[in-house]
Regions:
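Polar/charged low-complexity regulatory segments
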Residues: 7-16
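Amphipathic alpha-helical interaction modules
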Residues: 15-63
Length: 94
């Protein structure tokens, strides 16, 4: 495979990843708004954050993740701490 083709393939993958992240943000934005407007069950918040973790490499989705964590930290501190640690294990560069 020529280098030019490799570069084109990588650019296409990057474009697709951006599109997927945009879709994830658009799907999770109303869910995050809803969760932050009330007190949801631990299982509902945990389920949502677990699924959002896959997309937290995107700053917009990460912002939603953080909003939910801030809203529920005093309500479900152990679960939120676990979710934050999971984020760090997956996405922190260090």
């Amino acid at each position: 495979m020529k280098m030019e083709n490799v570069v084109d393939a990588i650019q296409e993958m990057a474009l697709q990843l951006r599109k997927i992240n945009e879709i994830a943000y658009n799907q999770y934005k109303p869910i995050a708004s809803d969760l932050c407007s009330r007190v949801a069950s631990l299982s509902e918040v945990e389920y949502t954050l677990d699924r959002m973790l896959d997309f937290c490499g995107d700053d917009a989705v990460l912002g939603l993740f953080k909003d939910i964590c801030r809203h529920y930290f005093d309500i479900y501190p152990e679960m939120i701490a676990y979710q934050i640690n999971s984020y760090r294990e997956i996405w922190d560069a260090e």
